[in-house]
Curated annotation (Swiss-Prot):
Cystine residue pairs: none
This protein's name: Glycerol-3-phosphate dehydrogenase [NAD(P)+]
Main location per the UniProt record: cytoplasm
GO terms of biological process kind: carbohydrate metabolic process; glycerol-3-phosphate biosynthetic process; glycerol-3-phosphate catabolic process; glycerophospholipid metabolic process; phospholipid biosynthetic process
Cross-referenced Gene3D superfamilies: N-(1-d-carboxylethyl)-l-norvaline Dehydrogenase, domain 2, NAD(P)-binding Rossmann-like Domain
Subcellular location: Cytoplasm
GO molecular function per UniProt: glycerol-3-phosphate dehydrogenase [NAD(P)+] activity; NAD binding
Active site: residue positions: 189
Length: 329
């Protein structure tokens, strides 16, 4: 199958590498013309995922039309902020009918829409829209270390058709029609990872980390259920699986944001040092707004938002959470 990958960050590049190494032709495209030239010349993404050479089956395209030609699937792996404009480009290039998966995680700022909802809004006639989510770090996938993820769409027939096509010896895919649950799990776990990074940075220990992960899962489940998701989805790869990885893994950008804030650094400084997008930061406010809309209590999210707004110190965030009224779990 020919697969088009839009977005050449670390995750987009890792997916392009992976699928091109497992029987697919892949075209990789990004808006950044300088990055395209660099990748074409070096046959490697030295900016986004250095150290991994591109196979012959991976083509880096300067022209999106070339990248979309004969494509059977489009993966949009931009930041959530770039998702809508990428979907609009598909329409512009006459490719709005192609099957498309959002492989980014978060809520769109200002609209509060989940990734698949953005795609449905831009491409209302497309019946093959979904998300790819789950516990997966780009570096590990590029090294061909095993992982398992979830492909979710409201179109069950398409999921049943696509999952076997994309399954490999390295990446095992599970299908789901609970696209809301899969998308919410992927989005909100980034917020919880900042909280656990904060706790770890303050050296509050493993007990505190376990408490934050567990109560974070409770927050995610409450919100997802209110939005129409199946609670059991949060017990799977797209829920607790992704949450554990992002909250504990050394490669987690969002956890590193929390670690940096615990050191007393300004948020902008932390983001510059990380050098990549942290979807958790841009998601916090939209998650809180959505929780308010559905009247869902999300204390971890709320206190983190106050931290980002400089209304609290890192220490006060943890103190506030510990001082909450006693209740049954």
């Amino acid at each position: 199958m020919k697969i088009t990958v839009i977005g050449a960050g670390s995750w987009g590049t890792a997916l392009a590498l992976h699928f091109s190494q497992h029987g697919n032709r892949v075209s990789l495209w990004t808006r950044n013309a300088d990055q395209v030239r660099q990748m074409q010349e070096a046959r490697e993404n030295k900016r986004g995922l250095p150290g991994f050479s591109f196979p012959e089956t991976l083509e880096v395209c300067a022209d999106l039309a070339d990248a979309l030609k004969d494509s059977g699937l489009v993966l949009i792996v931009t930041s959530v902020a770039g998702l809508r404009s990428s979907a609009e480009l598909l329409k512009q290039y006459g490719a709005g009918h192609l099957p498309v998966l959002a492989a980014c995680k978060g809520f769109e700022q200002d609209t509060g829409l989940l990734t698949f909802q953005v795609l449905k809004e831009v491409l209302p006639d497309n019946k093959k829209i979904g998300v790819l989510s789950g516990p997966s770090f780009a570096q590990e996938l590029a090294k061909q270390l095993p992982c398992a993820v979830v492909l979710a769409s409201e179109n069950q027939e398409w999921v049943e058709e696509l999952v076997p096509q994309l399954n490999t010896s390295v990446m095992r895919l599970y299908g789901s029609t609970d696209v809301i649950g899969v998308a919410v799990g992927g989005a909100v776990k980034n917020v919880m990872a900042i909280a656990t990074g904060l706790s770890d940075g303050l050296e509050y220990g493993l007990n505190a980390r376990a408490a934050l992960v567990t109560r974070g899962l409770a927050e995610i489940t409450r919100l997802a259920s209110a939005m129409g998701a199946q609670p059991k989805t949060m017990m799977g790869l797209a829920g607790i699986g992704d949450l554990i990885l992002t909250c504990t893994g050394a490669l987690s950008r969002n956890r590193r944001v929390g670690l940096g804030l615990a050191e007393g650094k300004e948020l902008h400084q932390v983001l510059v040092e990380i050098g990549h997008v942290s979807e958790g930061v841009s998601t916090i406010e939209e998650v809180f707004n959505t929780a308010c809309k559905y009247q869902i209590d999300m204390p971890i999210t709320q206190t983190l938002l106050q931290l980002i707004r400089k209304e609290m110190t890192p220490q006060q965030v943890v103190e506030r959470l510990m001082e909450r009224s006693a209740r049954f779990e």
